[in-house]
Amino acid sequence: IYKTDTFFYPSQASESSRRAFGEAWPARAREIVTASVDLYLQEHWGSALDAMRCDTHDAAPVSKNLTEKQRQAVKDKFTAVNLAFDLCEKGGQKTWRAPFLETAETLRSAVRDNVCVAYTQFYLRYKDSGFTKKHPEKYIKRSPEEVSLVVEGLFGGRS
């Protein structure tokens, strides 16, 4: 967050910053911001994103005729995703603040575009698959709407 915040405004490139740092500075600062956002996503959401990745060739809902091994794989995916959201909510990310509104919105947008989209597809693909015969609430803890609410509250967003 610090790196993203530090380089966001210089990337807007006023004439004085171009004179001071050279013509290539604004592009370099934007690269640093992008790399910092990507690093944040990988560090804090990477395992959840990996678990949510579906076969891109077939995003259709899964049939209800899953084998025991397939059911366990889906349970493991939901467990990994839930852990990432639990860490976000209870591990402090909800209280992190970005001093500049633009930085906060850049980070929220990255989470929205990556995590929320992936979760919605993941949820729709598996929610009715019958992967758990008892206690689906143990695995399906959040709806896509609830995930979006969590994301909108990150980095000083709405409470």
Regions found by a protein language model. Give the residues of each.
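Extended alpha-helical "rod" scaffolds
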Residues: 1-159
